[in-house]
């Protein structure tokens, strides 16, 4: 991105300011250049300038540490001015009132406006008496007698700033306010442990009572089924264990009776089969007897059947 030439009008005449190229990915150590003839070019403190690109985009510039002597307008070349390397990154700081829009150039400046001091490229170096390339210049922003760049940082460290319209610049001094609590915080109130224990105990007692009632009802039903037990004996104080014992005896007796009856049933089935066989034999004998009688009558023999009684 190429810098754009700016013109600043003062009482003494018109001065041309040539801005250099901004750092790109090809040369990460390069810095923004603003080279002029001398620091005395702008004797009028009301002179303003605007950094602006051709397409209205953002402008990247680099902060150079300048000694107090240079800030006070001493002779060029005196004092140490060190540049911060472009490869080091720090926390970005936003300077309030450091940038102005295009419309602000035509307005009258006030005492609180930002003024800029320029130093030639010969005054910029890595140490005392050292110089860098001829296209490098130091740019220091001051407001009154106080520097808006904040506290001075040691040499060898620096940061980059992005120049944009004042509407897009965040106010450095503004802080985000947190809404106060509408009501005092109260920890979650928990019911006493004794109350929970009592509630659980009451529920347990209710369950146990229902279970006992069911058992008592079943025992009463058993006492009605068992022949030896009766309601009178139960009312007289017969224990539940006695009723259960008699119920067990009765169940055993019923099982034995069932087994005996099953055996007798098998014997009856066998007798039934034998009876059927004998009945069939009796029928056969009767039929044979009838045939013999018929033969006797055919031959003229009279058969007299005598009963046992006779």
UniProtKB/Swiss-Prot annotation:
Residues 271-292 are annotated as: Leucine-zipper. One of its GO terms (cellular component) is chromatin. It comes from the Eukaryota. Keywords: DNA-binding, Isopeptide bond, Nucleus, Transcription, Transcription regulation, Ubl conjugation. SMART domains: HLH. GO terms for biological process: cellular response to insulin stimulus; glucose mediated signaling pathway; late viral transcription; lipid homeostasis; positive regulation of transcription from RNA polymerase II promoter by glucose; regulation of transcription by RNA polymerase II; response to hypoxia; response to UV. It is found in: Nucleus. Residues 1-26, 171-209 are annotated as: Disordered. The keyword Cell inner membrane does not apply. Residues 190-209 have a biased composition (Basic and acidic residues). There is a cross-link at residue 306 (Glycyl lysine isopeptide (Lys-Gly) (interchain with G-Cter in SUMO2)). Pfam families: HLH. SUPFAM superfamilies: HLH, helix-loop-helix DNA-binding domain. Disulfide bonds: none annotated. One of its GO terms (molecular function) is bHLH transcription factor binding. Residues 1-17 have a biased composition (Polar residues). Residues 199-254 form the bHLH domain. Transcription factor that binds to a symmetrical DNA sequence (E-boxes) (5'-CACGTG-3') that is found in a variety of viral and cellular promoters. Efficient DNA binding requires dimerization with another bHLH protein. Binds DNA as a homodimer or a heterodimer (USF1/USF2). This is Upstream stimulatory factor 1. It comes from Bos taurus (Bovine). The gene is USF1.
């Amino acid at each position: 991105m190429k810098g754009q030439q700016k013109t600043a009008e003062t009482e003494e005449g018109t001065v041309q300011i040539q801005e250099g190229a901004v750092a790109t990915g090809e040369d990460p150590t390069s810095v923004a250049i603003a080279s002029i003839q001398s620091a005395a070019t702008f004797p009028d403190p009301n002179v303003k300038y605007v950094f602006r690109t051709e397409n209205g985009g953002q402008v990247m510039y680099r902060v150079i540490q300048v000694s107090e002597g240079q800030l006070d307008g001493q002779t060029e070349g005196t004092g140490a001015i060190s540049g911060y390397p472009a490869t080091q990154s720090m926390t970005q700081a936003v300077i309030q009132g450091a940038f102005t829009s295009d419309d602000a150039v035509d307005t009258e400046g006030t005492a609180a406006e930002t003024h800029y001091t320029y130093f030639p490229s010969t005054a910029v170096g890595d140490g005392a008496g050292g110089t860098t390339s001829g296209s490098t210049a130091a740019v220091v922003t001051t407001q009154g007698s106080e520097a808006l760049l904040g506290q001075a940082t040691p040499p060898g460290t620096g940061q980059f700033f992005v120049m944009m319209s004042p509407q897009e610049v965040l106010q450095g001094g503004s802080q985000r306010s947190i809404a106060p609590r509408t009501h005092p915080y109260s920890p979650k109130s928990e019911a006493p442990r004794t109350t929970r224990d009592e509630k659980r105990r009451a529920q347990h007692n209710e369950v146990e009572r229902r279970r006992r009632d069911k058992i008592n009802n079943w025992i009463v039903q058993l006492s009605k089924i068992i022949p030896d037990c009766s309601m009178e004996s139960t009312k007289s104080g017969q224990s539940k264990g006695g009723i259960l014992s008699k119920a067990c005896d009765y169940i055993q007796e019923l099982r034995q009776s069932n087994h005996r009856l099953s055996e007798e049933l098998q014997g009856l089935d066998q007798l039934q089969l034998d009876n059927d066989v004998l009945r069939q034999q009796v029928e056969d004998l009767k039929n044979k007897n009838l045939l013999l009688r018929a033969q006797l009558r055919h031959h003229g023999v009279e058969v007299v059947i005598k009963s046992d009684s006779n």
